[in-house]
From Swiss-Prot:
Protein's UniProt keywords contain Iron: no
Pfam families on file: RNA_pol_Rpb1_1, RNA_pol_Rpb1_2, RNA_pol_Rpb1_3, RNA_pol_Rpb1_4, RNA_pol_Rpb1_5
Oligomeric and partner information: The RNAP catalytic core consists of 2 alpha, 1 beta, 1 beta' and 1 omega subunit. When a sigma factor is associated with the core the holoenzyme is formed, which can initiate transcription.
Reactions that this protein is recorded to catalyse: RNA(n) + a ribonucleoside 5'-triphosphate = RNA(n+1) + diphosphate
Residues holding Zn(2+) 2: C808, C882, C889, C892
Protein name stated in the entry: DNA-directed RNA polymerase subunit beta'
Residues annotated as binding Zn(2+) 1: C69, C71, C84, C87
SMART domains per the UniProt record, alphabetical: RPOLA_N
Sequence positions that bind Mg(2+): D460, D462, D464
EC number of the protein: 2.7.7.6
One Gene Ontology MF term: DNA binding
Cofactor note: Binds 1 Mg(2+) ion per subunit.
This protein's UniProt keywords: DNA-directed RNA polymerase, Magnesium, Metal-binding, Nucleotidyltransferase, Transcription, Transferase, Zinc
Species of provenance: Rickettsia prowazekii (strain Madrid E)
Length: 1372
């Protein structure tokens, strides 16, 4: 017996390893066929039997009934294989009607519309004609010259009827040959000699210099090579014979009313057959040319409509004016074959029902209604009933089950025991949306769900439904139990934190239980055991909140029990009792008021130190305790719990005064409208926060009153602070003031809502708030779809990313450090490196001890060593640098977040990454509406304060002292560092240009001391010398104009875009500084004092006045701020992973060098950078209106911004390389999610980036057959180069290119996967011509062809099968 067969008989789908797609030749089509369809008839309207030679002919396609010929002469199995001599039908199973094909011999050749119209058109590219011209020939509009003969006509020239006639008159009838229709195209394609053509194209490519021509040649050359390699013949793109698909796939069914419903394809086929038969008759009867030609055109159109209706001209429509569904439409889109039937199938043994909460279930259980269980487990019940002899036959068993006899229920109980079922809640956004549970039979009709798994399913009990699926085979049950059991999915795969976390009322109950009140009954009593305390509690000597002392035995590090006395309360001890005993889990973790965060932390600790079983038991008990006390606490809230602070009116009055002042400044012309708007918005933001803070203080301190049973703590406050429900944002609106509202476009309305919900809103306020609320509702509706689409694209691009080996052996890695923003450490280093592996040996900086070996996993204990060593950056391995040829290795990926151990081989990390990024996107878009449109925007940062006592260090300090003796920063990249006594960096702040420095290098500062301040709403332009102002190129009305503010009537001079006027095109508005002699002053960097002003700048000086150092000559207003929420965020994530050019993108410097402004070109400014190493200078052309952030003579580093904005990803890759690009994308994507408090591990984003960097673009072909500009897979490129070097040829060179995820998915190695994603026809056309082979490596293609996916258990089956095949080959 061969080794392969040891793994069970291989099904059909597993007997092949790859699939190849080709263009079908006419001979192939005939060989598939079982006969020619010559009649358009379908079935006889009286007998309902298929017509002979028609579209449903039984002779061609097989019998209609199993083992029965059409006339009924032969029936039953005994005659199988006989062909009836009367009706010609073979006696066999009727299933063959799904498999057997027919064909139609076409009377005239017809072009295949996919190769003609799918862009770029393959036929026209090969013939080097335009598509319009080819169409004109095919649809009988123009003739084409095939052989110019003795005439001066060109080969391939098009002629109309008249031109042809003229040419014939001029040169004679037989002097040249011109022809029309598909025949001539077929002939031209036949005449192509590919090997010769290839050489010609190669030669031409080397001599041509035009880029456009090169591109065209490369395209054609690529196509020619495809044809050569795939052994397709080009004339096969024109068809002589048309395949007819099996009749069962285009069925004709009888409806109740005696009418028929038919597939559109039948109608389309009928048209083809009718026109074909008519054409045959016309040719036979030698009809006039014009009639034959018209019929040929009609035939071409009929075949077009069959293949791809509507692709060319008007779509063929049925009687109800609906276009017919053609063969292409059957494959395309969500309802097409790929997505509807191959990737997603409806399954048997499933049911769905409403869910209700099941608080008494254990974590691994779910309640299944008896009715559902009976239906789902029917086959199992039948076999058991028969086995026990309760029922004699299956039929008897069936009757018993239908009658619901008592024995049936006993059998059901037994069948169901330990047989896991899968529960799924749509939408399944990540893998935790399907989990396995052991069913418990319950009465009623609703499924019971354990409360702790709701977070993973994102389920609530307001009418949600869930589906139940039954794993049937023993392997499926095993997988369900081992991988999918809810108890095995405690940690979230997105961030490695527990996802089985108490929520809502459990949190509230636990918070209430662990509160300690002052002056409770029996405060300070001592206890030594719990029974004693219960006694005291029962007799009302203490309450659960009384502060008491307690002697508790605790495990120390040596594992011995030691008694300790702790200050605690009875409630906290009850939680403490549930803790598993472990020296690492100390009582102090729960000896406090437990909020949701604390509980999550404790569950995490228990999981890390005590393992999974202990965690599950602990979580379950915690839940029971929480529910109990949430109930007995009797927490509820009423109107009086919403406290409106006394100080509210004072704050509002103060702010209104402030705003009056801004209005005044504005009317006096001191500030622009934009500045006023920003200041007003800021003032109100601050006011809202102050009111909210006062309200929080009042809520947090309970009112003193005389009722003995009065609730000691505000219920609303308790719900929010414990993390049970609601946020301070919402409470602020209940009792503070609602604050500023946003318009639907994200702009903030200047007048805030001063009332809160308790006082009630005025009509006007209500109207204003409706705006923002509506935005939330609309967002939710629109964004959910786009988020789902993003997830789908991510899954598609990453689906073939699988862990394929333990270690790829690379030495590369990436350097990570903590994320610092605004001087605060937002993400500590620890968070970024936990669960990754070290790329190099890591030593202690002081003692030089080895902390980590290269390739060692960084776990919690190693983290502590790294933190105590004070390391601030570390080299870790990353999927970006992994060198596995297919998939990724475990070491580069690191820890599998869902288990906390090193990731195992066969794990589908790509899909997990896609889900981790996509799932929160969907959640977040649904979350906007809870706040109801209240603007959430922090006041603008306008100063920097010291966050520590420290020493100041200033980097790139370039300062001038102005007339007020203030230090003004003149450098564009000034940074202020705070250092501790050892010189370690504690904080880093960017100080903007034009800021006032309040400290200097080397100063010692104390915490909260102000270090620098600036105007946050404008970018100033500052002088560094004193002198006299001279305006240049400021022409009133062309480059500058007085803008009079309507509200104030005060004019100010503003620079405007001058290119609308012919004489304005050359103007470059600038200010020059002159010395006393009238000469232009020279600055410290040796350049003249000229200040160029961008469009929109507001002048602060007059022509001819004297100014001093550090004065502001002009201000550039910043745009008014809009609120940031995930709606700004989700499109931002999409923009990043699609690698789109951002709107108003930044321009970055490609080298280190000095900046010079060159001569302008039309409406563009020219920025030149002279590199320090004296190489060629680089020019950048930027639109004039853009604000350039560098000045003439500034020194810029490689990668610095020259123009503000978001940089283009492709530029970062080109200039700074992969690591910087990856860091940037990770940082930007994380920033979006961090804003919403969502945690995603960096490695997931890195996986997606790796998939975006799969391709390289050839820059030099060397000795290989690659073409310059060709885009090819990284690994394929390496393989080709390895071959070339082996043969002693020069290897090709290429550069990495970044592709958006949509493009990357469409260009995967697998055409099946690409076709099922988008643009199905284009992908299949391309694949067929190139004769592509799909190796079936990813998940999607395997699902489509119906095999186990090569991930998880399927990965090992696949591996073992391949090994077995190898063994068999060796044995042979």
């Amino acid at each position: 017996m061969s080794v392969v067969n040891f793994y069970g008989q291989l099904s059909n789908t597993q007997q092949f390893d790859q699939i190849r797609i080709n263009i079908a030749s006419p001979d192939q089509v005939r060989s598939w066929s079982f006969g020619e369809v010559t009649k358009p008839e379908t079935i006889n309207y009286r007998t309902f039997k298929p017509e002979k030679d028609g579209l449903f002919c039984a002779r061609i396609f097989g019998p209609v009934k199993d083992y029965e010929c059409l006339c009924g002469k032969y029936k039953r199995m005994k005659n199988r294989g006989i062909t009836c001599e009367k009706c010609g039908v073979e006696v066999t199973v009727s299933r063959v009607r799904r498999e057997r094909m027919g064909h139609i011999e076409l009377a005239a050749p017809v072009a295949h519309i996919w190769f003609l119209k799918s862009l770029p058109s393959r036929i026209s590219t090969l013939l080097d004609m335009t598509m319009r011209d080819v169409e004109k020939i095919l649809y009988f509009e123009n003739y084409v010259v095939v052989d110019p003969g003795l005439s001066i006509l060109q080969k391939g020239e098009l002629l109309t009827e008249e031109e042809l006639q003229k040419a014939k008159d001029k040169y004679g009838e037989d002097a040249f040959t011109a022809s029309i229709g598909a025949e001539v195209i077929q002939q031209m394609l036949k005449e192509l000699d590919f090997s010769k053509l290839k050489q010609e194209l190669y030669d031409e490519l080397h001599i041509t210099s035009s880029e456009v021509k090169k591109k065209k040649l490369v395209k054609r050359l690529k196509l020619v090579e495809d044809f050569l390699e795939s052994e397709n013949k080009p004339e096969w793109m024109i068809m002589d014979v048309l395949p007819v698909i099996p009749p069962e796939i285009r069925p004709l069914v009888m409806l109740d009313g005696g009418r028929f419903a038919t597939s559109d394809l039948n109608e389309l086929y009928r048209r083809v057959i009718n026109r074909n038969n008519r054409l045959k008759k016309l040719i036979e009867s030698k009809a006039p040319d014009i009639i034959v030609r018209n019929e040929k055109r009609m035939l071409q159109e009929a075949v077009d409509a069959l293949f791809d209706n509507g692709r060319r001209g008007r779509a063929a429509k049925n009687a109800n004016k609906r276009p017919f569904k053609s063969l292409s439409d059957m494959l395309k889109g969500k309802q097409g074959r790929f997505r509807q039937n191959l990737l997603g199938k409806r399954v048997d043994y499933s049911g769905r029902s409403v869910i209700v909460v099941g608080p008494e279930l254990k974590l691994h259980q779910c309640g299944l209604p008896k009715k559902m269980a009976l239906e789902l487990f029917k086959p199992f019940i039948y076999s058991k009933l028969e086995l026990y002899g309760i029922a004699t036959t299956i039929k008897a068993a069936k009757r018993m089950v239908e009658a619901e006899k008592p024995e049936v229920w006993d059998v059901l109980e037994e069948v169901i025991r330990e047989h896991p079922v899968l529960l799924n809640r749509a939408p399944t956004l990540h893998r935790l949306g399907i989990q396995a549970f052991e069913p418990l039979l319950i009465e009623g009709k609703a499924i019971q769900l354990h409360p702790l798994v709701c977070a993973a399913f994102n389920a609530d009990f307001d009418g949600d439904q869930m589906a139940v699926h039954i794993p049937l085979s023993i392997e499926a049950q095993l997988e369900a139990r081992v991988f999918m059991m809810s108890t095995n999915n405690i940690l979230s795969p997105a961030n490695g934190r527990p996802i089985i976390v108490p929520d809502k009322d459990i949190v509230l109950g636990l918070y209430y239980l662990t509160i300690a009140f002052d002056n409770e009954v029996g405060e300070g009593m001592m206890f030594s055991d719990l029974a004693e305390m219960e006694h005291a509690l029962y007799n009302k000597f203490i309450t659960i909140h009384t502060k008491i002392k307690y002697r508790r035995d605790q495990l120390n590090a040596e594992g011995k029990m030691v008694p300790v006395i702790i200050d605690t309360t009875y409630g906290r001890l009850m939680v403490g009792e549930l803790l598993p005993s472990n020296p690492n889990i100390e009582f102090k973790f729960i000896n406090k008021q437990l909020t949701k965060k604390d509980i999550s932390l404790v569950i995490d600790l228990v999981y890390r130190h005590c393992g999974q079983k202990a965690t599950v038991i602990f979580a379950d008990q915690l839940m029971k305790l929480g529910f109990k006390y949430a109930c007995s606490s009797g927490i509820s809230f009423g109107m009086d719990d919403m406290v409106v602070p006394e100080s509210k009116s004072t704050h509002i009055n103060e702010t209104q005064l402030e705003i009056k002042e801004f209005e005044q400044q504005y009317s006096n012309g001191l500030i622009t409208y934009g500045e006023k708007y920003n200041k007003v918005v800021d003032a109100w933001s601050r006011c809202t926060d102050r009111v909210a803070n006062d309200m929080m203080k009042e809520i947090a301190t309970p009112p003193v009153n005389d009722y003995p049973n009065h609730q000691k703590i505000n219920a609303i406050y308790m719900m929010a602070i414990s993390g049970a429900r609601g946020s301070f944002q919402q409470i602020k609106q209940l009792g503070g003031m609602r604050g500023l509202m946003t318009k639907s476009n994200g702009q903030i309305i200047q007048t805030p809502i001063i009332s809160n919900f308790k006082e009630g809103l005025t009509e006007f306020e209500c109207f204003n708030s409706a705006n923002g609320m509506r935005k939330g509702q609309i967002d939710t509706a629109l964004k959910t779809a786009s988020s789902g689409y993003l997830t789908r694209k991510l899954v598609d691009v990453a689906q073939d990313c699988i862990i394929t080996e333990k270690d790829c052996g690379t030495d590369k890695g990436i350097e990570v450090k903590s994320v610092i923003e605004g001087g605060e450490i937002i993400v500590p280093l620890a968070e970024k490196i936990l669960g990754r592996t070290a790329a190099i040996d890591i030593f202690h900086p002081v003692t030089n001890d080895l902390i980590l070996n290269k390739g060692e996993l960084i776990n919690e204990s190693k983290l502590e060593q790294i933190e105590s060593a004070g390391l601030d950056r570390i080299m870790i391995k990353s999927v970006l640098t992994c060198e596995s040829s297919t998939g990724i290795c475990s070491i580069c990926y690191g820890r599998d977040l869902a288990t906390g151990t090193l990731v195992s081989e066969g794990e589908a990390i790509g899909v997990i990454a896609a889900q981790s990024i996509g799932e929160p996107g969907t959640q977040l878009t649904m979350r906007t509406f809870h706040i109801g449109g209240a603007a959430t925007k922090g006041a603008e940062v306008s100063s920097v304060e010291a966050s520590y006592d420290a020493k100041v260090k200033i980097i790139s300090r370039n300062v001038v002292i102005n007339s007020e003796e203030r230090k003004i920063v003149m450098s564009r990249n000034c940074e202020l560092l705070l250092l501790d006594n050892n010189g370690n960096e504690k904080a880093r702040h960017k100080i903007p240009y034009g800021a006032r420095l309040l400290v200097d290098d080397g100063d010692m500062v104390i915490k909260t001391q102000k270090l620098a301040e600036w105007d946050p709403y404008t970018i100033p332009i500052i002088t560094e010398k004193s002198g006299k102002v001279l305006f240049k190129d400021m022409v009133e009305g062309i480059s500058i104009r007085d803008v009079t503010d309507e509200a104030t009537g005060i004019p100010s001079k503003v620079i405007i875009e001058s290119k609308q006027y012919s004489r304005g095109a050359e103007l470059r508005p600038r200010i020059q500084l002159l010395d006393s002699k009238g000469e232009v002053i020279t600055l410290s960097n040796g350049l003249e004092a000229r200040y160029y002003l961008p469009v929109g700048a507001v002048l602060s000086v007059e022509d001819g006045i004297q100014i001093s150092v550090g004065d502001i000559i002009a201000r550039i207003p910043k745009e008014s701020t809009t609120t940031k929420d995930i709606t700004g965020g989700l499109p931002r994530v999409a923009e990043l992973v699609e690698a789109r050019r951002p709107k108003d993108h930044a321009v970055i410097a490609e080298v280190d060098g000095r900046v010079e402004f060159g001569k302008d070109y039309k409406s563009k400014r020219r920025i030149i950078i002279h590199p320090i190493d004296g190489t060629m200078s680089i020019e950048y052309m930027v639109p004039k209106g853009k604000h350039v952030v560098v000045n003439e003579g500034d020194f810029v580093k490689k990668g610095d911004l020259l123009i503000d904005g978001n940089p283009v990803l492709q530029d970062i890759l080109k200039v700074m390389g992969v690591e910087v690009l990856a860091n940037y994308i990770v940082k930007e994507v994380q920033a979006v999610y961090r804003l919403q408090g969502v945690k995603i591990d960096d490695k997931h984003i890195e996986v997606i980036i790796r998939q975006m960097l799969q391709k390289v673009e050839v820059t030099d072909s060397g000795g290989t057959t690659l073409l310059v500009g060709e885009k090819i897979d990284r690994h394929e490129f390496d393989e080709i180069n390895a071959k070339a070097m082996k043969n002693g040829l020069k290897p090709a060179e290429a550069q990495l290119i970044l592709q958006g995820i949509t493009k990357a998915s469409l260009q995967t190695r697998s055409f099946i996967s690409a076709a099922s994603f988008q643009e199905t026809t284009r992908v299949l056309t391309e694949a067929a011509i190139a004769g592509k082979v799909d190796k079936l490596r990813g998940l999607k293609e395997n699902v489509i062809v119906g095999r186990l996916v090569p991930a998880g258990t399927g990965y090992f089956m696949d591996k073992m099968r391949k090994a077995a095949v190898k063994l068999d080959e060796e044995n042979v």
